[in-house]
Structure formats: structure tokens, C-alpha cells
């Protein structure tokens, strides 16, 4: 009898449990994802190069993150997508000057509760000593599935991270643009190589699905949307991966400094959100992920994204107080006087002829290296160094990036080919005196400034030779090299020592490969000298030794015919800068 009663009770209990389970309510989990990318050292709302207040910054992002965490709590995930270690002197100071303190980029992201980071090409450019130290100091994993250790054949960094919130399992796969060998010397990434993004993503997607069985998969790619093939390598393959590798719900991208928020269909017909917050923490990617769960399983999910403007948020006083010592250290560093300059110089003149700004770079490169010819471009579209004291901050205007100085062997014919391609990207082929001298994006909207069709950091001129640029001629026929700067003959068949930065020397901008016609694999064999430190370091040393700089245009090149180019330069200067050419 007791046995029957026990069985009856058990059956009733099981029935109740089954009824309850069958009527279990669905549960919605909301997760907020905030992506920063290409912050480029813009940690404080102050430009330490131009010495003025600035937009964006992690100080504003902190205010936004705090606001979102009040709403979503631990379900608010801050993710960084790389290129955080180069740009402003704040990063440079903790990269190379104060190497004993915790790197400010690590300390700030730790403070803000970042859950995962990614490697960017400008992080790699700082070199192993810097990025290895920074990675160790981050309280979160820095990803890089396609950064491969030559010794093991395995990823040098953690390939993916698993994040769990309220029973929802999220996988984040990190990758970097594989085009780094096209820009950076091997010493900066020694012992490593970079796998193409699409095959890497395909392989890791299978591993993640099989091993982790996540509910949501996020791609964290330091690569732009699409295009730009460098040799056999695609620089920006994020869209290809989003469309061609089924499984991603969200793809967070960066690198190309271009805002984007769009949904694309993958090969299975499912939507994938692709979002890019551009650079300098002026906006962040703001993604809302809603997961509906029942019986411990995901039955529905939705993804919505937008770009949130950080300039609508106040600077976080809490953040600024916490990092006040670091702010002061950087401010003291950039305020140090290293010399004086006799006149104001600007890159604005560099597009229209020989200019004091670029010719100062040429002179320094030739003096430091002992080369016969120098190549250099305006690395900032509109940089200026004012007459008077030169401080460390001015050096970041004079030379924007941490490039090394190379000396390479080039033939006279290769020098001409290099310049032909450079000027074809920069100068229009004029058919009439009324045409533009510069190669602009057309049409130019009425009342708006003109923009170059191509990147101005690829507009190299030369020093050490006298030459003309005939803008009535097509590419391949524009450049006439008259002589060496000292008047001696220039020989198309002779090999010359050419000073240029490491970005260009490794094939950046394609001027050495497509222009000069040197095979990519041969470039490293042409390098006969490379500095140990970045070019800015040697420029600072040079100025401290000289004490007074008296820059002037060397007038070793000019646009012709003069009767066309001089009036056209005045018109185009006004279109570019909204002011008259002096």
C-alpha cells in the first residue's frame, strides 16, 4: 500500500514538473556591445600635438560606458579593435619614454572594464618590446587569430574569447589586416607571419562552433570593409568574411577610419551587422543584442546597431582625476623646448611646389643618411610649425608616424618611375589653362572644400635632383630629371642611394612596386641602411644639435608650364583650404 502511495506521489510530482517546464516563460537577455577602434592615443580630450582642446577621447567614452552600465550592468561589454598605441604623444610617451610604468593604454582600458581587445597594424608598428609589454598589462585578452608564430604554426595571440552573460554564450574571433608586411619592416614583427582573413575565419568558425557551441558569434576585425589588394594580399576583407563565412551575427571592424553601420546577407541568407566607428573615439559602435531563451536554449535573437556620437557626452571628471598624473607626465614631455625655427612652415604649400616644410624633411633625411636622393611626402594634410620655439610636440607635426629611415639602392630609371606614379596620383593632366592643377574628387560641391582623389601621404617629392613635372602630359611622361642637385648629370642606368621612410621602403603606397617596377620580394634586398629608432627620434636629435632651424624651399622641382600652373595653383589652393595662396 505504501509502495503504491509513493509511486502515486512520484507520478504527480513528475507531472507537475513537466507541466511547469512546458509552461516555462521565455526569458529575454539584452546585451549592449560598445566598440572603440583606431583610438590612436586619443585618450584625453586634448591634442598634445596642436596644444588645444580636442573632440572625442576615451575620457568621453568613459561617460558613455558608465551611462550604459547603469542600464545594462554587467551585460554592457566594452571591446577595443586595435590601433590604440600610435597617434598622439600620450601613446608615444608610454611606448618609448616611460617604459617602467603600466602602459597608459592598458591601464585606461582596464579601468574602463574592457572585456576583449584586438591587435591593429599601428600597434604592431611599435615593435615587439612595446606591444608584448602592453598585452601582458591588459586585464583582458588581446586577440589575433591570423597572427601566426613561425616557431609553432599556432596563433601568437589568443584567437578568440568566450564571454557568458545570463546563460548566453558569446564567442569573439579577432583578426588583423594581413597586409602588414607591405608597410612595416620585419624587425617589428619578427618571428611572425599574417594569414589571409577569409581562410583563417573559415577554419576558426568550424573550431568555435564544434568546441564552444556559442549562441552568438562576433567578428572583431582590424581591417576595413573591402578592397585594396597589395600583391596577393587583400588589405580590407571584413565584408568578404561577413558575407562568405556563415555564422557571424555581428562583425565589428576598423582600420579604414570610415564610419559604417549596415546589415549584409551571408551565403545562408542571414543578416550580419557590420559596424565601424572610424577613428579617434569621436563615435563608438553601439550594438544592442537581444536573445530570447526558453528551456536554456536560444529561440530567437536580434541585432541592432548605430554609431553613438561621443561629443554629445561630457568629459568624465572621474576619469580625468584618476589619470591626472599621466596627463601631467605627457604634458611635461611635449612642452620641452628642443630648438627654435626662424619661420612658420606648413604642409599646405607642399602640394604646389618645393616647400620649406617638406624640404626640411628632405634635408634632414639626406644629412642623417648620407644618401644622394630623398623621397618624402606630407604625412599630415594640413600640419604647421610656427615661428619661434620648437617643442617636442612640434615633432609630431613635423613627422606624424614612427617610421624608420631607410637607404635603398634605386636606378635612375626606377627613381623616375617612382616619381611618375606619385605625381600622377596628385596632379591632374591639364588640357586647358582653366583646368585644375590638382587631382580632385569630382564633382566639387558648390560652397564646399575640394578633396584630393588619393591619399596625400603618398604624394612623394624628391630632393637631391633637379626635375620638372609637366602637367599637360600623361603618367609616364610628366617627369623630366634635368640633373643632380649639384648640376652633375643624372644617369638613368646608375644606381643611387635613396633615403625614404620604412613605410615606403616596405612597399607602402605601391610607389616602389607599381611605380618603380621593383618586385615586392626584392625590396628588402635593396635596403642598405636602416635606423634602429624611429625617424622622429633622429629629427629631434638633429634639431637639438643645430639649435636654430632656418628652413627654406630648395626649389629643386616645379610644375610646368608656368603660365598655366601658377594661376591654377592659386585657384586650387583656395578650393583646398578656403584661403588665398600667399
Language-model segments: residues:
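Bacterial Sec-dependent N-terminal signal peptides
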Residues: 1-27
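A composition-driven signal for long, intrinsically disordered, charge-rich low-complexity tracts
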Residues: 4, 13, 173, 504-505
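Catalytic centers of hydrolytic enzymes
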Residues: 26-32, 36, 41-51, 55-67, ...
